[in-house]
Regions:
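Phosphate-/nucleic-acid-contacting segments
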Residues: 5-8, 12, 16-77
Length: 77
């Protein structure tokens, strides 16, 4: 079930991103609370997932709060 939350968060992030050149970027801010509601998990769990994704290089938070996705890293999980 734990992997399910990671997968659902990844799906929401990928669907929310727009392609700019060869980069996928999420410009609109999605609060941890909103993300938690979307994936049916607690805010704490979503925060942990986002922290793990950041540490693994799947996401990178840019100045101003936009999120850069590195899907190649996600697919290698």
């Amino acid at each position: 079930a734990l992997m399910g939350v990671y997968g659902r968060v990844a799906d929401v992030l990928i669907e929310s991103a727009t392609l700019e050149g060869d980069k996928k970027i999420i410009h609109e801010k999605i609060s941890r609370q909103d993300l938690a509601k979307m994936v049916g998990a607690s805010r704490e769990m979503v925060s942990r997932v986002m922290r793990d994704f950041d540490e693994q290089g799947f996401i990178q938070t840019l100045t101003g709060g936009a999120i850069l996705l590195n899907e190649r890293r996600a697919e290698s999980r």
